[in-house]
Amino acid sequence: DNQRISVTQRQSVLDALTLRDAGRNAAQIKQVLEEQKMDSSIYITLETLKYLKKGGRITPAAAAIGTVLNLKPVLQIQGEKLDAYSKTRGKKQAKRVMLKAMQNDWENRFAEYVKRGEMCLQSAYTGNEEEALEFKKEIAEAFPGIEIVQNPLSLSVACHIGHGAIAVACSRKVVVD
């Protein structure tokens, strides 16, 4: 269990294939993937608070107030932890916060891996592909020259956060000498 989910888990599968093709056995692949389990970040913002309320993550009162104030939470996933990262007014501000958080991760937390070309960027969404493609363009402007893979969020994530969520993620990728 390398505690990855959705788009960062996709990169883990690609890493496992890279290691397999390089002649590593299952135990070696498992070891590498588990060693790198914390080398990823996901920032997600939601269209609605409805599913957080239904899942018991926020109270009905908080959901009602948040909806009236157009609050968009930015959630962060690192390893197995899902935490509130920020509360913003509107999706535009939420996207700015997510991009700034990702830039901070790249410049600080993952700086050494970025220098060595061991990081990759992902964009993800639930349902609204058109909005997701626009956000991918914003990510590309913030990270010029970096390939960005975009996929729908997994159903296991989507059922908790609802339609209209968008995310930016990064994960360390395996580089075999």
Segment roles from a protein language model:
Residues 4-177:
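Mixed-charge interfacial surface used for oligomerization/domain docking
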